[in-house]
Amino acid sequence: DSVASRGLGDVYKRQLEEPLLYLYGDADSGKSSMLRGVVHEITRLYGPTEAKIFVVDYRRALLGEIPQDYLGAYLTSHEMTEGGMSELAQFFQSRIPGSDVTPDQLRSRSWWKGAEGFVLIDDYDLVSTSQGNPVAVLAPLLAQAADLGLHVILTRRTGGASRAAYDPIIQRMTDLGATGILLSGNPEEGQLIGKVKAIPAIPGRAQIVSRDRGLVAAQLLWVPPSYQ
């Protein structure tokens, strides 16, 4: 695989062109910074009527980062996430094209109107546990996410990530060839995205694995919290 350096803007712009992204990284490796960068890019490219952001963030690391007029929901517990994701799944199911939708409508996505929906999940390992996974209701929608205006971006710690391969959301993303990012992590976790292992690295140093570009190295710029 070819390895090249890429900047922050290209990484985020490309992600918003794709519906699915997952990221693994240790503590202080740049996971929440990446999500803040995604939020900045969403608000740069879309107006508040064109994009709504739904945050699942049990540690509240992104609290105050999403402008109020873009915020669809901020979910900080299992119970809140269960209700919020169930409602969101029902909403996006209503956008699934029926048999009367023409090929031209499919190409232009003109059979529905409304905002793009961005689901940002920080510390996914706190969300998908042995007690259940309230985000799993989105799994059946991921194959059609681009057609439905649904985007799912999640981060997870590297520890135990090899077990996450069997998680319904991550497994579906993997099956669909979603782009994955590895920040700093322990290589003893094994192959996490394709055949790529995590490596110890400075914050923001990323290995980006995509179906069409293979393995690309990038340094994600630090996006500071807005309250600092």
Task: Report residues per predicted region.
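Mechanochemical coupling/switch segment within NTP-driven translocation systems
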Residues: 33-35, 41-135, 158, 185-188
